[in-house]
Amino acid sequence: MRARRLIILLMMLLLLPQAQAERLTLYTRPGQVDEATPFQLRPTELSICSVTRAMGGVVVLANDDNYDSLSLYFWQDGMTEMRKLGGGFYWVMSSDTMETAQESCEYSMSRVPNYRMPDLTHAISNLTSDGETLYALNRINGLIFKISETKDGLQTEDVCTMENLSCLNISYRDLETDKVYTYPASLTRMHVCGSVLAISVMQENGIKVVLVDLTDGAIREIAGESLEAMYEWADGELLLWRLEGSTNEISRSSGTYTLSRYSVATGEETLLSTGVPYKKRSECGAYDPYSGSYYDVRTRQIVRTTDFVQEEPVVTFPAANVNIAVTKDSIVGVNLSSVYVRSKENGDMTVLRIQSSNGASNTALQHFAEENPEVILAQETLTKSAMNAASLAARMSASADAPDILRLGLTPDMPEADGSWPLDVLMDKGWCMDLSVYPEVLDYVSRLNGIYRDAVTRDGKIYALPIYAWSYGYFISRNVMEKLGLQESDIPTNLIDLCAFITKWNDNLTGAYAAYTPLEETESYRERVFDLMVRDWIGYCQAENIPLRFDHPVFREMMAALDAMRTDKIEQANQQVNEEISDYRECLIWTDAQAVGNFANYADAFGSRIFLPMALTPDVTTHYGIGYMTVLVVNPRTTNADLVGKMLAQVIADQEATAKCVLLADYDEPIEDSYYLTMVSDYEKTLMELRRQQENAPAWKKQGIQERINEEEASLQRYTVRERWTIAPKTIELYQQTILPMSYLRRPGILADSDAFNALVSQVHQGEISLEEFVEEADKLIEGLEQ
């Protein structure tokens, strides 16, 4: 029996390194380090720069922040921690020259104990390998050199010097002055292809690929405005991605790409695929020579592909968008602060699919991935065209790749045919799983403010999980109000009075208030106020649950006020060039600033902005429309209900305070700014030093020091009252007692996506139709849409 136990124990020990290698964290940057701790006693603080396959494993390049120099670390399958190969290299920034590098080193020498001046000839900008040997580039002098490990430490061997360095720059032409400006470009990737070093160089549009002959430093380029990315491939070849169509940011994210194989030796380019979507390409992947496949990064998920069309989910990393390198058995992923290892083959893993219209909670996903390493998180971004109930239902009913969870950003510009949100239709059609089966969700939803709870519940069932809400509104600039000598009671609180206020400003105050504007600067105040009236009238009808028609006494009263409003002097002043006034003029009233969801700049006693409830007329109820909400919806056909429950619980646990403050009725926890205590401590240290100097100063100096003390104390007082809170106690009070009671969840409405209605508004702007004609034509349009 004893012998059998020993055999079992031995087998477990033999298997342990392999089991550990499936899920290793080789390094995580420590948290806040006490500045008083000597450098030699501090934990290693690394800023991870890159990872590359080399020397039978991988080499991690990292900056040791304690000693301000680059070090190289090695890991291979079977190891449980990285081994330091050596260090002392200088890390070249893109804008560095030999002079700035020398100055930086001299500064480090004065600050860092035991700092040794590095060899700036062999400084490192980027590091790569041919799979075994490390190659480094120093962009300051164009030197390319090898780095190898010997019994005496790391040794460098010069390979060649680039014949010119201008190819590593980016140039752009200023359209106003026609001048051409040149500055150092970012070098995104490097690969060794036989006797050539390929460098991906960022350009104004896409990239160019610089090919450096390692025998003599000669340079040639693969150019083209459509070239967007370069990957390593087999047998000295590169994979090139080219954008199909025009080059602009919109087409880059929504357009399609061609994929071709480029032979560095012959210059021949072979087309492999066309019409490849943006989501199929990233800048973080790695070629796997052991299997002839490519591992690519999809947020946290790693996929394996050979044709960049079909993908196989492999594993999930805790962090998003890691850069990876592969060994025979493992994938090593790095970001700025961590180094992770995951096995290529993790057996039967569950795939939890999340499709999102507006990003995801990084904290919740990271914690979920750490706690559930057997789960692959497959994340996909929903395009705007997919944000309708029919498309979402089709996705959830798909036989393959159907999402388990939808993260939907509900906004004013994503209406259904009846003007509702897609969520409303999904709930009506039975495409939302009842989440009341999850205790954490049930408890959370029971604590929601009523308007959010009512939006996701029907007959005691919970069909979505609200995780954030935000909206915009009217604000008074406290600073401008005080500079103008006004009181809050002087500011209009309805659109009728706003027209009269603008007229008074126009007739009497344009000269005196030349450095300020009543509203955000606009070429036409009449257009701006008309748009506000239309927007707020549509919202009022929705809040009051009355049919939307513009032929209504309240709307006509607003149109009469608009017709009487005078803005000629204001708009004339806007067009005048006055060298004494800056191009940007401060405004008194913001009409579209974020009110709900961002509480940092207002609502405390000394905030820079004052929330301004704005009614339509003096005689109607004031409403505030909250038009943006993010919810999680669960596919009723999911086969991963238990994992979904874990994910929802994680999202609730990691919810940020600003979201809780908006959503939860029982939220009462003020949040201090994370930087506040540090700043107060700095002020107090300064005051302590000034008082010490004052005690020891001669009499004639004491008064001057006292004046400085008074200035610092006043500055500390201002900082304390204005900058202390991220969420101030008065913010919570204002939101719960003033904003919420007048709030409603504003749906897009049937006019939200109407080109015909937008054309009518434009005709009013251009003076092509009268306000009376607008009322008549808009109501005809609404009647037609309602049929």
Where are the regions a protein language model picked out?
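Beta-propeller fold detector
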Residues: 25-32, 37, 81-91, 155-170, ...
